[in-house]
Amino acid sequence: MAHKKAGGSSRNGRDSAGKRLGIKTYGGEHVIPGNIIARQRGTTWHPGLNVGMGTDHTLFAKIEGHVQFRAKGNGRTFVSVLPIVAAAE
């Protein structure tokens, strides 16, 4: 006698929707205060200059400027927002 249950389809078919994580604003792109730079679980990317981190580890811009990603020697990647330098008139 078979002691394996038949592969019934009623046991299958459960899955969760994707959480839309990842980089939302790439290096060199312009941001304004409050723009989301990255959504993540944990600290894949760490906040650098002028970047804040929300309670769910979301990185966001604190000032207007351009996004910069920078890898440090310790294996961590930091995200900063560099202010826009006004042209001398």
UniProtKB/Swiss-Prot annotation:
N-terminal signal peptide: none
Keywords noted in UniProt: Ribonucleoprotein, Ribosomal protein
SUPFAM superfamilies for this protein: Ribosomal L27 protein-like (SSF110324)
Segments forming a coiled coil: none
Region (Disordered): 1-23
Biological processes per GO annotation: translation
Top-rank taxon, per record: Bacteria
Molecular-function GO term, any one: structural constituent of ribosome
Cellular component annotations (GO), alphabetically ordered: cytosolic large ribosomal subunit
Family named by the database record: Belongs to the bacterial ribosomal protein bL27 family.
Cross-referenced HAMAP family: Ribosomal_bL27
Protein name per UniProt: Large ribosomal subunit protein bL27
Classification lineage: Bacteria, Pseudomonadati, Pseudomonadota, Alphaproteobacteria, Hyphomicrobiales
